[in-house]
C-alpha cells in the first residue's frame, strides 16, 4: 500500500465540501449546519492564504480517502480530520493520524464530541490522552518529543 499527504489546492473544494456535508460528519462537527458551495469556496481561498493553518488530502494507493488539518495555536497544534464516508469502518482515521504525526514533534491537541466513537478510538489508538471534558466535548493531547 502507498500512502500520501498532499497540501490541498483550491480545486479540492468539491470533494472537501462533499465530505464536510455528509450527515455523520455534520453531526460530529462543531458547526453542524449544511455548508453552501460559495461559502465553502470562500473558506478554502482564505485557508490557502493562512500561514498557521495547513490542510492535506490523505490518499491510499492514489485514492483520496480523507483530509487532516493542522492549526498552529502557539502552545500546541490542533488537528481536525475527516474520513470519506465511502471509507468508514476501515480504521483509516487512526492510520491517517499516525502517519501524519510520524516525523513531527511537539504538542498536539484535538477536540472530539463524546458521541463520535470512531474519532475517539482513532485519537486514543494514535496515542492521544484525555485532558478535559466539558459538555459534549472531550479534549485530547499528545506530546511528541
Regions found by a protein language model. Name each.
Residues 22-25, 34, 49, 88:
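Residue-level marker of structural boundaries
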Residues 32-33, 56, 139:
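Sparse recognition of residues in long alpha-helices and their boundaries
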Residues 24-44:
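Conserved GNAT-fold acetyl-CoA-binding loop/helix
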Residues 1-15, 19, 59-145:
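Acyl-donor (CoA/ACP) binding surface of acyl/acetyltransferases
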Amino acid at each position: 500500500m502507498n500512502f500520501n499527504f498532499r497540501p490541498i489546492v483550491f480545486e479540492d473544494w468539491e470533494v472537501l465540501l462533499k465530505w464536510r456535508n455528509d450527515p455523520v460528519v455534520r453531526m460530529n462537527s462543531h458547526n453542524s449546519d449544511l455548508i453552501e458551495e460559495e461559502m465553502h469556496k470562500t473558506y478554502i481561498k482564505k485557508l490557502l492564504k493562512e500561514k498557521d493553518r495547513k490542510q492535506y488530502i490523505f490518499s491510499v494507493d492514489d485514492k483520496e480517502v480523507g483530509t487532516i488539518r493542522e492549526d498552529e495555536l502557539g502552545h500546541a497544534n490542533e488537528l481536525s480530520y475527516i474520513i470519506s464516508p465511502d471509507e468508514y469502518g476501515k480504521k483509516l482515521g487512526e492510520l491517517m493520524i499516525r502517519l501524519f504525526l510520524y516525523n513531527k514533534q511537539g504538542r498536539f491537541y484535538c477536540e472530539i464530541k463524546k458521541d463520535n466513537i470512531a474519532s475517539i478510538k482513532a485519537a486514543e489508538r494514535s496515542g492521544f490522552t484525555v485532558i478535559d471534558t466539558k459538555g459534549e466535548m472531550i479534549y485530547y493531547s499528545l506530546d511528541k518529543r
